[in-house]
A protein has these predicted regions:
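Interaction interfaces in information-processing and related assembly proteins
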Residues: 2-99, 137-141
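A generic structural signal for ordered secondary structure
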Residues: 97, 109-111
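Flanking scaffold residues of small Cys/His-coordinated metal-binding clusters
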Residues: 99-103, 121
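Short, cysteine/histidine-rich loop/knuckle motifs that typically chelate Zn2+
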Residues: 106-108, 128
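Cys/His-rich microdomains that often coordinate metals
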Residues: 112, 133
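Short Cys/His-rich "knuckle" micro-motifs
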Residues: 115-119, 136-138
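Cysteine-rich micro-motifs
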Residues: 123-130
Length: 141
């Protein structure tokens, strides 16, 4: 699993206290920390990649070497673009935490659940709605 799919930062799984409210302040803070660390990690990786790309830009005389370098750069730029989009999604998710919308399925309003959110903190659908969406996607081709 790559950095763009879920956070790499290790964290202690959240253990709700008996009778604790779903998405109360302690849970929101738990996910705020996970998402902020993930965003910072992605930003740092993008910065490292930018420096790497600047340092590695060489004007190779051999066309094959140039082609290899260009395809590596294209792949790197695609990865950076995915990371930029993910950072935007993380920012939107942090806004959802602040507005009180976080943790609830945008399709059926059910609780998404702590374990699913820890596995995929930017999830906006509960597992049932996500499964249904994937089935529909496969049927549509």
């Amino acid at each position: 699993m790559g950095m763009t799919e879920s956070p790499q930062t290790s964290f202690t799984p959240y253990q709700p206290k008996k009778g604790e409210t779903y998405m109360g302040e302690p849970q929101k803070e738990h996910f705020r920390q996970i998402l902020s660390a993930w965003r910072d990690e992605l930003s740092a990786e993008m910065e490292r990649a930018r420096h790497r790309m600047q340092d590695e830009t060489v004007n190779y005389p051999d066309p094959t070497d140039r082609a290899t370098q260009e395809s590596e750069m294209t792949l790197e730029l695609r990865t950076r673009d995915r990371e930029r989009k993910l950072i935007r999604k993380i920012e939107e998710t942090l806004d959802q935490i602040d507005s009180g919308e976080y943790g609830y399925c945008e399709s059926c309003a059910a609780e998404i659940g702590l374990r699913r959110l820890e596995a995929r903190p930017t999830a906006t659908l509960c597992i049932d709605c996500k499964s249904l969406a994937e089935i529909r996607e496969r049927q549509m081709g």
